[in-house]
UniProtKB/Swiss-Prot annotation:
This is Homeobox protein OTX2. The lineage of its organism: Eukaryota, Metazoa, Chordata, Craniata, Vertebrata. InterPro entries: Otx_TF_C. Residues 34-70 are annotated as: Disordered. Residues 45-70 have a biased composition (Polar residues). It comes from Rattus norvegicus.
Length: 70
C-alpha cells in the first residue's frame, strides 16, 4: 500500500510544477514576464534574481551566477 502511494505521489510531483521548482518559480516568473517588454538590461538582473531564489540551497553556485551576471 505504501509503495503504491509513494509511486503515485512521485508521478504527480514529476509534473511541470516540479520542473519549474513549484509555485516559488511561478511567482517569480510573473514579474519577470512583466519586465520582458522592458529593456534587455532589466531582463538580466531579473533572471538572476529568479535563479538566485532557486539556488538558495547552493550559496556557492549562487555566488558564481551573480558574478557571471555582473
Amino acid at each position: 500500500m505504501t509503495y503504491t502511494q509513494a509511486s503515485g505521489y512521485s508521478q504527480g510531483y514529476a509534473g511541470s510544477t516540479s520542473y519549474f521548482g513549484g509555485m516559488d518559480c511561478g511567482s517569480y516568473l510573473t514579474p519577470m514576464h512583466h519586465q520582458l517588454p522592458g529593456p534587455g538590461a532589466t531582463l538580466s538582473p531579473m533572471g538572476t534574481n529568479a535563479v538566485t531564489s532557486h539556488l538558495n540551497q547552493s550559496p556557492a553556485s549562487l555566488s558564481t551566477q551573480g558574478y557571471g551576471a555582473s
